[in-house]
Amino acid sequence: MSRRKVFLVGDGRVGSTFANDLLQNVRIDELVICDVVKKITEGDALDLEDLAPFVGQCTVKSGDYSDAKDADIAVITAGAARKPGMTRLDLVKTNVKILESIIKPIVESGFNGIFVVSANPVDILTTLTQKLSGFPKNKVIGTGTSLDTARLRVALSHKTGVNVDHIDAYVLGEHGDTSFENFDEAIIDHKPLRSYKELDEETLVELETDVRKKGGKIIANKGATFYGVAMCLTQICKAILENKALVMPLSAPMTGEYGIHDLYIGSPAVVTANGISDVIELHLSEDENKKMAYSAAKMKEVVDGIDL
């Protein structure tokens, strides 16, 4: 069996939580953590290696960009965090500069694996990661609407009493204010969502608003969101390293799906050892198609305005 190595850039709350989740859920041989604050990565490496007796042997170390050379995956969580009252798009200018300083040295190291991005605004930064790296589009992945979708399924579970494992519903579009729910195709416990009397139109509108605002509410209460997105990252890495063919709603490359080109946006996609092996284009109603087009247009406007 080949040696499995993950290179992590960003050791803040998302990065450190992801590192912990990864070691507990995926068998890897080496994890290298890179951050501008070297002292933190050194401390986390020492802390995380204590998991070995409980989860299995793994080399964990603080490193630099040269360590990305032989990694299977480069995970990017580094970036300015969203503060109360901010939208994810407010982070663009700052985080694009940070992203540029990360991608170049990773590519120069000889890295030939798969990029996985969670830094916000994730759809835009994933799009720019592909452009900056020149990597094939399937080799660049963003967490997209995987967290939004998890929040939607939790909310639907609360409303219906159905276990989240039996809820198949997606949030699509931007991981941000222009996201939307694909209610027409949603299935709850083998029945169409629309067949549930307790999920009338008014309730669904309230639920959609609650899902969209949940991240901001968490940030207002505790300063950041990190548990959910860290597990999203872990599941993506697991699918890549174990060739799982996992379907997740991700920042996926559009090559005509939904009428969108040259942009990463939230849509179900299949993750395998080769990265994104397929983008699943869901059937959308006329209204949902308009929402997807609007979401894409808003992000495309931002991307086109960035001078790389």
From Swiss-Prot:
CDD domains: HicDH_like. The keyword Cytoplasm applies. InterPro entries: L-lactate/malate_DH, L-lactate_DH, L-lactate_DH_AS, Lactate/malate_DH_C, Lactate/malate_DH_N, Lactate_DH/Glyco_Ohase_4_C, NAD(P)-bd_dom_sf. The keyword Cell division does not apply. Catalyzes the conversion of lactate to pyruvate. One of its GO terms (molecular function) is L-lactate dehydrogenase activity. GO terms for biological process: glycolytic process; lactate metabolic process. NAD(+) binds at residues 14, 35, 65, 79-80, 101, 143. Pathway: Fermentation; pyruvate fermentation to lactate; (S)-lactate from pyruvate: step 1/1. It is found in: Cytoplasm. Keywords: Cytoplasm, NAD, Oxidoreductase. Substrate binds at residues 88, 120-123, 148-151, 225. This is L-lactate dehydrogenase 2. It is an enzyme of class 1 (oxidoreductase).
